[in-house]
């Protein structure tokens, strides 16, 4: 009986090891017990190898734990290695275009003041009765970014239906693979499609700006509305809509820009937003003679301003998408950590059940031999 008690203790001890434990128990046969000769004293004995064998469920849990931990490593890497640097690049791109926008705003303001109350012909500032609207919708090219794409698509679809309900015709200019795929499948009228990727360029913005201005100036649309995701913070974004053309002179000269800056402290990312002052109108002396008519200069500046606004919007949308992806990867990592803890508890319970079952079998075997 002593040998079986030793075996039982070994089985209990093996429950606290990380791997299944094998041990050898030398037990006396019935004849040896009857004669009072034990295995330690006789060469006639048999060996029984006892191993705590995990059942299929426990093995499946162990494999799942490994899979969850590997997934968590991937999501953390996507957040730290891929998303964060791209947000910084988008931030730097916005800051780099700011001087150009400020100069255009300043020159435009100065020319408007120089023209004073004159009746001027500025086609991109001319308002007319709205019978048809073109929606410029900016979405992302990829998924794994939470509700970034779905929120923008829902807002665009709601605005389209609102215009139709009010008797206003509407069509779409789409930027981004996700929006293109969604609206194409549902048969929406699409005027033009663009894919700008994660690093929008001035050339891509120029192509979109030319399409927008030609659509408005040709009279095919009476207004173009811009729908994009405004970058608020790393954990929040705001689907926004505003009229892109016709421009309002007061909006151009009276609104300052907001810039964002990605910060990090104690391993945590954050965003600082700064509202910039309006660029002061450039002063042109009354005796200054322009080689070209000021109206022609303004008409030349407005397309450049439109191009700059679209480029800035594309860059801000990319920053919003990347921030949403960072947050999505952080949530996925947190969920993976919680799931791994839960699975570890289940695995330990399964191991405990296997140890208990093995112990009961040993004790039952000992009782049967007595």
From Swiss-Prot:
Localization terms from the record: Plastid, Chloroplast thylakoid membrane
GO molecular function, one term: proton-transporting ATP synthase activity, rotational mechanism
Alphabetical list of Pfam families matching this protein: ATP-synt (PF00231)
Transit peptide location: 1-54
SUPFAM superfamilies associated with the record: ATP synthase (F1-ATPase), gamma subunit
KW 4Fe-4S (keyword) present: no
Chloroplast found in the keyword field: yes
Topology in membrane: Peripheral membrane protein
Family matches, as Gene3D superfamilies: 3.40.1380.10, ATP synthase, gamma subunit, helix hairpin domain
Entry keyword set: ATP synthesis, CF(1), Chloroplast, Hydrogen ion transport, Ion transport, Membrane, Plastid, Thylakoid, Transit peptide, Transport
Active site: 145
A GO cellular component entry from the record: chloroplast thylakoid membrane
Protein's job: Produces ATP from ADP in the presence of a proton gradient across the membrane. The gamma chain is believed to be important in regulating ATPase activity and the flow of protons through the CF(0) complex.
Sequence similarity: Belongs to the ATPase gamma chain family.
Subunit structure: F-type ATPases have 2 components, CF(1) - the catalytic core - and CF(0) - the membrane proton channel. CF(1) has five subunits: alpha(3), beta(3), gamma(1), delta(1), epsilon(1). CF(0) has four main subunits: a, b, b' and c.
Protein name: ATP synthase gamma chain, chloroplastic
UniProt organism field: Phaeodactylum tricornutum
Gene: ATPC
